[in-house]
């Protein structure tokens, strides 16, 4: 089409500038360019900065292109050409150079043919996929041979050589790779065994792990020549925390026992790269098929599909993706989702639905009459249009983007390349296709919401319409017999005044006009209307300029109901929703909202949540972890408010959530450090990082509250003479210091989703003046020779919350030895009582007639000090007392060991739990932790009696 359009002025200017640069760089080569293709050259370099810069960098490409642009069978020779080029390559550096040069050459060829309409969409997608497969497989083959020379050939028990199979996932697996794309891979090998023929034998798992690491580096690492592909390995079993390579047997066990819906979804497109080279390919295929395609019509997938639909909508709102042709409403993702949903549901019974290609699947759906032909036509046409647009958009500058451009030059480039006279015409065509796709998407997947909303009384419509007239509002309130009408009217008038200061478009005003009468009808009659209305309207004002959130509440009555319920129950939750309105998405599914993640699944769920974000995009990774935390806090609080979780379970959930986040942050910080410096060499033959995080206080005692800080200490076990193995080599201990600094930074950086946790590291050896991270040996020495009694008290509530087995064992040994050492009773009593007195002076209640639940006599802190004192006093003879770090189980253990009587232990536990429960309730209500002094009298007296019995009182007690 572009050949029939006159080149726009803006494009001509860009073409002239690009041609001038090319003329300056390669005048002699440019002179050899065929004159009949001069106009084509100018057009293409005006359309694509990638092509223009590639030709400037490598003038020989001009000669090569003039000979090969019309070679239709070109892609079939990729592997043969690469094999020839690599035959004389001597080392990994040469390999990387050859791969990058070949990729650039072929990507220019593909982009050129795309911009000049010489290739169909199907041809272009196939060429891109074949090129990636060729680069992967020839790099693999070269590296496999090199690794066999270095370490021997991996074999099974029968002595047969074992290959590593590379599974291409996503669009690569489907043969539909886009122009600038990550490649999602999974590595596997048929059987365990050992290498033979090397200097020393090595387990197959170790051989293939090293091979996989070198393959990723060959493709992914940026060099002077660029890179080939961003390699994403997070779709493998267990994600980042799993082994890089797994045997068939381990792979099968994982998918049978732990495979999840999204992994079935991902595995639909899985394809073995270069499968014709491997006799073991069919075995792998047969093994995976039952996991992906169930033998029966799998309607159980429908609920999972609805959840995925909700995730798509959330993604659009979260990242402002309305102009994203992949993730926006009606985008490429929705077409893929429709096709793959039919594959998941019916693929077990219908072999024709097991194809990897999307257009192939749509054709099968048409043949099986699973959708009306008209709907399938809309999907096919929309998909082809958007995929072509996506490729051209990315080929402008070889950038991975699906967001429509803002720059006029890029807009006119796209319009011209797509065959449209101007940007507006193209944009209207985009909207037409995406609207058609979205209609099909909504029709097929459906929604759990009841579309029929109840009619809102005219009084509430009038209340909102007349919300500038106080007298009218008061009259309506009187007619409705609304409680506390004056305060409610004041809130409504204040909301209107705030909204008048904001720029609301016609759409936003229309949505508010529909939404607010419904909001008022639900809140105004409530006994607690004043407080609830103030909280809900504050949130609505906050999101007023973000129409998608208003629509979410307006179109989902159940979500609005959940919002009101939660805001009524807890000012803390209301404030959280107001600060982070992205959490409104969580209200769409009450079953999900009121059922927190199982304790043992926080880590897996967070890994899955982060898998959608490129590892190198640290800003988005940080944001995603915070969003995940906020969503989980909301779910825990919702279950708490609903009475579905007792206090201990709430703390368990908050603690396990914190541990999962700590693991994710450590992994993120480690990736950043390792990329820059490599890893300390003492880890070469060891799993783990040689790094530990010790949790103290509430996190150490499984007693976190909603707003708790994390008290932590960092440890490592790096020997003194160790260095890292990266290009920028540093001392191993310096590496761990920088790692700890990075972790603290990742936790404390404030993003749009807030701070992750407040981190307190003052409990480390020597406090604020000490090193941020210590070796286990120096930690041990400090605890033995320099630590104060209060630091040993703190150690009672300490446990390792992140770390590998050697460090865990080492820390546990240090903790037990310190806690069980013999102590002089009188000195210990003096130290503990003195410290408690200092705390009470500084932190105790100054309010007459009030009891401070935490710091006043007989309160929580007295109970904690009793537990710590008794552990330190009696662990020398009863080492079992050191087993637990939480107060409840410490008291249980004391009763078992007869350190306390059963009645004393029960009384302390009961007092501790009821006071914690009240602190927790006050936190949810956003209130200080003080109660009338007439409360908890019995509990306080009991605590003080036990204190008097076991601790010698100081003169001020």
UniProtKB/Swiss-Prot annotation:
Any one GO cellular component localisation term in the record:
cytosol
EC identifiers of the protein: 2.7.7.89, 2.7.7.42
Which protein family is named in the record? Belongs to the GlnE family.
Q: Where is this region: Adenylyl transferase?
A: 457-957
Q: What is this protein called?
A: Bifunctional glutamine synthetase adenylyltransferase/adenylyl-removing enzyme
State the Gene Ontology BP annotations: regulation of glutamine family amino acid metabolic process
SUPFAM superfamilies, sorted: Nucleotidyltransferase (SSF81301), Nucleotidyltransferase substrate binding subunit/domain (SSF81593)
| Cofactor(s) needed for function | Mg(2+)
Instruction: State what this protein does.
Output: Involved in the regulation of glutamine synthetase GlnA, a key enzyme in the process to assimilate ammonia. When cellular nitrogen levels are high, the C-terminal adenylyl transferase (AT) inactivates GlnA by covalent transfer of an adenylyl group from ATP to specific tyrosine residue of GlnA, thus reducing its activity. Conversely, when nitrogen levels are low, the N-terminal adenylyl removase (AR) activates GlnA by removing the adenylyl group by phosphorolysis, increasing its activity.
Source organism phylogeny: Bacteria, Pseudomonadati, Pseudomonadota, Gammaproteobacteria, Vibrionales
Cited NCBIfam families: PRK11072.1 (NF008292)
Q: GO MF annotations for this entry?
A: [glutamate-ammonia-ligase] adenylyltransferase activity; [glutamine synthetase]-adenylyl-L-tyrosine phosphorylase activity; ATP binding; magnesium ion binding
* Segments of this protein annotated with the region Adenylyl removase: 1-449
Catalytic activities: [glutamine synthetase]-O(4)-(5'-adenylyl)-L-tyrosine + phosphate = [glutamine synthetase]-L-tyrosine + ADP; [glutamine synthetase]-L-tyrosine + ATP = [glutamine synthetase]-O(4)-(5'-adenylyl)-L-tyrosine + diphosphate
Which keywords, in A-to-Z order, does the entry hold? ATP-binding, Magnesium, Multifunctional enzyme, Nucleotide-binding, Nucleotidyltransferase, Transferase
